[in-house]
């Protein structure tokens, strides 16, 4: 497997020309910014010594506030206080309303169905809100480093799709930041721990943040980070713990389900405070809306146990993808504030058979890894031997005749990557080809996800199979896909960059992988049937053209035998007997062998007519 050097050409710098770079952990609940100073990566604090910046923005007509100031307004002005905006990135309004029906915001749909949040400052999309958080982090870094940033590395969940990654890059540009690279959060954590410990072997990175869960299985060897497999859930995190506990408190307190937004916010704040307290205490007293009661750690554990189990199921799938057993994992790194919950650490330790590493603050480890990566990419460590390989989560391919999916880049292929595959025309005189880009693990188009469509026109009018079209898939370091189709003889080409308007849900991602395993045998049979039907159609199409042109070369008996064979093939091709179709194709080939030879002889005679032997 090829290993990719992180350092980019032309970015090396002399020591006295050190460039300023930062790593940003743009989190669902909290965000951080870190940098490398005097050879050490560290997170940067605000004037009050706080390293975490709540990912909350409060909008007013005259301006906005970010972080702690914004969070204090959450209970007072819920409609104008936007939190957990990361969950909204890259999703349609319909998807958001279905998944998060209790959000206290008023939405409008843009022309293409994307969400616009109604605030006192006007209609704002999630990209703009994220940009305001990034601006606050960049301002902290600029002040701490006494200079403008030359570039940043921003972390994203490993399961973020194209739309979510592109939205993150757009937010950074809106904030005036130069993005060196988007980096998967678990991979950033591996960088932080790998450089510090220098250990070699298989490592699992269990990342349970506020809004997302990711599991990565990596192999470390002599400074090389190879991502063997990734998995996770793009809509599962500590926020879900909070909401479950808030609902439990609401039921105990007898508060109506559809109470006003202010009460809902008070419930959520009480749940968050109780969750934090229960990490150290066996029970906690809760006061909310005039009600007082006790919540025990045991009750909390019972509420969240199903969610923790879901994360472990994803861990099991990732291990299977990586081809390793749990007992082969040397170390387990936990990332994200939600891993402070005792039940999480306990269950993770039981699953992997060893206690997880916690020597680096789980809230800071991702930002620290991003800072190390940014320091390399900006050119401050040109001689670094650190290597990094990421993977794509689902296979990418094309629709072919018969509704089949031809995989071009398999799932878990390391990125960046470019793969090409040649295709040809199906019909005589075909001058255009529709390119349908697919994502998924199944064999048929109907069972996979459509990413994009575009057309290649200007193909030379040649017999079926005469034109050769090369389709190239390219996935960049940020996981964004571009597809190019080129007719090789003329050089005519068409391309598209895949930026879907919204992404897959967590259940869709999990089910696509699960279904590919559950229906593997069924899919193979369906593919074999579809392939034989396509071949039958091709044979009949070719035969009809040949008969129309040269039927005079056949005797009446020969023509009847060919017609009978073709009719039988046409009939069995309507059924689902693969062997019968295959035998019928062979019979047509047998009945037309002499006819094909005569046509070839006739073509040669026509080509030689009027030419001497010497000319030949």
Curated annotation (Swiss-Prot):
Coiled coil: none
Disulfide bonds: none
UniProt-recorded Gene Ontology molecular function terms: ATP binding; ATP hydrolysis activity; ATP-dependent protein folding chaperone; unfolded protein binding
InterPro entries with a match to the protein in the record: ATPase_NBD (IPR043129), Heat_shock_70_CS (IPR018181), HscA_NBD (IPR042039), HSP70_C_sf (IPR029048), HSP70_peptide-bd_sf (IPR029047), Hsp_70_fam (IPR013126), ISC_FeS_clus_asmbl_HscA (IPR010236)
PROSITE patterns: HSP70_1, HSP70_2, HSP70_3
Record keywords: ATP-binding, Chaperone, Nucleotide-binding
Entries under Gene3D superfamilies matching the protein: 1.20.1270.10, 3.30.420.40, Actin, Chain A, domain 4 (3.90.640.10), Substrate Binding Domain Of DNAk, Chain A, domain 1 (2.60.34.10)
One example of a Gene Ontology biological process annotation: iron-sulfur cluster assembly
Keyword Transcription: no
Domain of life: Bacteria
Function according to Swiss-Prot or TrEMBL: Chaperone involved in the maturation of iron-sulfur cluster-containing proteins. Has a low intrinsic ATPase activity which is markedly stimulated by HscB. Involved in the maturation of IscU.
Family: Belongs to the heat shock protein 70 family.
Record protein name field: Chaperone protein HscA
Organism: Escherichia coli O6:H1 (strain CFT073 / ATCC 700928 / UPEC)
The organism's taxonomic lineage, starting at the top: Bacteria, Pseudomonadati, Pseudomonadota, Gammaproteobacteria, Enterobacterales
Gene: hscA
